[in-house]
C-alpha cells in the first residue's frame, strides 16, 4: 500500500505542474529517495501514466490525461460548452471544438460537435496537441490577433484549417479555447474572418457564463 500511495503522490505532483519535473525535483517534493522515485516512475511510464520529455524530465502521460478528461467532463466549462459548440457548428457548417491546456507544451480536446458534411475534420478527442503548432494552442497561450482570434492553415495537419479564440475564467485567466476546424479547400480567407468573428463571439459568451470580468471590470 505504501508503494501505491507514493505512486499517487507522484502523479499528483505531476498533475499540479504545467512544467516537466526532473527526477531530483520529484524526489525532493515527495520527500523520497531518488532510487525509489526512479523505480516508481519507471513503472508509471510503462503503464502510460507518466512520459519522459525531450529535456529529460517527466510529465503526465496519456492515460493520466485521459482520466483527467473523464473527470473534467463534470466541470462547468465542459457542461456549458455544448450550446456554444452546437451554434458554432451550425453557423459555420464545420466541426467545433473545446480544448484546454494539458501541460506545459500541449492542449487536449475535451469536446466536439462534428460537421454535418460527409468530409470533415476527424475527431481528436483526448489527443495531445502541441501548443505552438495549433490554433487552440496559440489561443490558450493568449497569442491572438487584434480581432481576438488566431487562424492556422495546414500547420499541424496538411489540408486542415483551424480558427480559435480563448475563453476566460472568473479571474480573467485563459481556461479554455473554442475553435472551428475543417478542410482547407472548403475554408476561404473570407471564411476565416467570418468564422473568427463567430468563435470570438461564442468565446466571449462562454467567458461571461463562467464569470470572467468584462471590459472595464476591475475585479
Q: Locations of the language-model features?
A:
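N-terminal helix-turn-helix
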Residues: 1-72, 208-209
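Short amphipathic alpha-helical/adjacent loop interface patches that line ligand
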Residues: 30, 41, 85, 196-199, ...
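Amphipathic alpha-helical effector-binding/dimerization core
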Residues: 59-144
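Short, basic/aromatic recognition patches
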Residues: 77-88, 135-165, 201-209
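Juxtadomain coupling helices with adjacent low-complexity linkers
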Residues: 146-153, 158-159, 176-219
Amino acid at each position: 500500500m505504501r508503494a501505491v500511495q507514493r505512486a499517487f503522490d507522484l502523479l499528483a505532483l505531476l498533475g499540479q505542474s504545467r512544467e516537466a519535473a526532473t527526477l531530483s525535483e520529484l524526489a525532493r517534493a515527495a520527500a523520497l529517495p531518488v532510487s525509489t522515485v526512479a523505480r516508481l516512475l519507471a513503472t508509471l511510464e510503462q503503464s502510460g501514466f507518466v512520459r519522459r520529455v525531450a529535456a529529460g524530465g517527466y510529465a503526465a502521460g496519456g492515460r493520466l490525461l485521459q482520466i483527467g478528461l473523464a473527470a473534467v467532463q463534470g466541470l462547468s466549462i465542459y457542461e456549458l460548452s455544448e450550446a456554444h459548440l452546437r451554434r458554432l457548428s451550425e453557423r459555420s457548417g464545420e466541426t467545433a471544438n473545446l480544448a484546454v491546456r494539458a501541460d506545459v507544451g500541449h492542449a487536449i480536446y475535451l469536446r466536439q460537435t462534428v460537421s454535418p458534411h460527409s468530409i470533415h475534420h476527424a475527431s481528436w478527442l483526448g489527443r495531445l496537441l502541441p501548443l505552438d503548432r495549433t490554433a487552440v494552442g496559440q489561443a490558450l497561450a493568449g497569442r491572438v490577433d487584434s480581432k481576438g482570434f488566431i487562424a492556422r492553415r495546414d500547420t499541424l495537419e496538411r489540408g486542415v484549417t483551424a480558427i480559435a479564440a480563448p475563453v476566460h475564467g472568473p479571474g480573467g485567466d485563459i481556461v479554455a479555447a473554442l475553435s472551428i476546424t475543417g478542410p482547407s479547400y472548403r475554408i476561404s480567407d473570407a471564411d476565416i474572418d467570418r468564422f473568427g468573428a463567430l468563435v470570438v463571439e461564442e468565446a466571449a459568451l462562454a467567458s461571461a457564463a463562467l464569470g470572467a470580468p468584462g471590459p472595464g471590470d476591475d475585479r
